[in-house]
Amino acid sequence: GVLQGIGASAGQVQGPVRVLTTLQLSEPIAPGTIIVVPYTDAGWGPILAQAAGLVAEVGGQLSHGAIVAREYQIPAVMNIPEATQQFQDGQMVRIDGRAGTVERLTETAAAGSLS
């Protein structure tokens, strides 16, 4: 399905999701990863620098995450309620930072791992 939020930094990217609810990273963010976060503030800057895209539960075009995403020229979609519960690590999504859409390309993380 496609979720509609607020487009905050233009561009399109598709890739795997990494859900982050805290700034404490257990492992580095892999290249090409789209991060899904509850909110952003100044502390998220170094993490955003590693991300290919951003989805946030709250915020708009003037929120910190949106401004930083534009600086780093990564697509960002804000205001997707409960995004951190709706997505799973490794799930493939496509985000459009102009239209403000987040499209699920796979329903669950690794479709190929069911044996």
Indicate residue ranges for each PLM-predicted region:
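Non-catalytic, soluble scaffold/interaction modules
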Residues: 1-115
